[in-house]
Amino acid sequence: MSDYLLQMNGIVKTFGGVKALNGIDLKVRPGECVGLCGENGAGKSTLMKILSAVYPHGTWDGEILWDGQPLKAQSISETEAAGIVIIHQELTLVPDLSVAENIFMGHELTLPGGRMNYPAMIHRAEALMRELKVPDMNVSLPVSQYGGGYQQLVEIAKALNKQARLLILDEPSSALTRSEIEVLLDIIRDLKAKGVACVYISHKLDEVAAVCDTISVIRDGQHIATTAMENMDIPQIITQMVGREMSSLYPTEPHDIGEVIFEARHITCYDVDNPKRKRVDDVSFSLRRGEILGIAGLVGAGRTELVTALFGAYPGRHEGEVWLDGHPIDTRTPLKSIRAGVCLVPEDRKRQGIIPDLGVGQNITLAVLDSFSKLTRIDAEAELGSIDREISRLHLKTASPFLPITSLSGGNQQKAVLAKMLLTRPRVLILDEPTRGVDVGAKYEIYKLMGMLAAEGVSIIMVSSELAEVLGVSDRVLVIGEGRLQGDFVNHELTQEQVLAAALSQPDSHNNKDRKSA
């Protein structure tokens, strides 16, 4: 009998004559966690769709061996029956159903006569949550009453209830806090010890290094290398993923910092559902020409509320003033903000950044269509010229600007949103989680673009939950905690510990507005 639980040999998948996968191999032993690494568009998702029979046997070439026997599944239900379960990045839970009902969805326990056996399902659901070290979870409550970390655990419990022997985890930590990520990684280690195998897909290479035994890298649809993690480090993984040496994940583009051009004065935002509660409380700061200002803080600190208020997009009541070049400007709506020279690339690009029904080019020119208008017609030639220039400038990978934007990888969708805002020629560019869900190569290009824009005199505000990213690209760092300004640091030998200490400190324990640190 084979030592491997799973063997995918010579997998080839073709779309319209183009090989998306060209001879990919992937092997997983029982109790092993394999990190599947590659840039967006490398073929990771296609490979997992083949494994889980989203693309059934016969639509691809090669072979899959499961426990040494050929697997020729025609449906997801067949692969799940075999013990292969995928947990998608976007969770598949039904918010209004209870935790127990979600765990048993499609596999409900019934009594004679066909009625649901709720006591048995609740008992089994409680046992599964105890196994995942969440003994106090009320499995009778709607799953919507629990946060992202708990919902991720419910998805894992759902998979274990299907007798999963191989878990495929696709970007499992994308919506989790740092503490929730640590819980998730501990649970994966426990599952490994019980013989459950995992394929872990993540752009967060520190997580991959922490939990995976083996790293398998694919690039442009081809298998590059499979190596034991103990013989690898993160820079080596990055080099294999992008196909070139990267001296640093954070490129240093020299840029001069000039005079103060932008000021936020006494910004206060009130909760949409509870108008008496302040989500942002009297925050003031300044920004210099060509400066990159990072905003750090814990989840729920009020960072996104602050920057959406600066752009005129905060849905609740908010107060304060925004000044540019020494004068107050009108930022009551996004359109007024754009016209004043202030632009925002939002946190959730799928809901707020792109229009999925439009093409790549249409999304890019959406904010400046009036500049291509001639009476009642659009100057299509001028519009296409601008689109092509931005695609080239941002190294946006697309076969055609007329393709649907949903056909692009996450990193290239983000570049399209950036291109849209750059066409407005902003003086101040606000980036809210600009690299979330973006692969390491695209991250590098976004950081490099930020440095180039700063060198051109554009002032940048960047919100990020990744402290390493904040420290890697920012000239100055603001720390927000419980809606208040907790620290204003010059980024010279600044450490993650200093930033975290400021984020965790009590808002009234010191005079934040005068706080500077080297």
UniProtKB/Swiss-Prot annotation:
Membrane topology of this protein: Peripheral membrane protein
Domain spans labelled ABC transporter: 6-245, 262-507
Protein's name according to its UniProt entry: Xylose import ATP-binding protein XylG
Enzyme category, top tier: translocase
Natural source organism: Pseudomonas fluorescens (strain Pf0-1)
Enzyme Commission number, as recorded: 7.5.2.10
Binding site for ATP: 38-45
Cellular component, GO annotation: plasma membrane
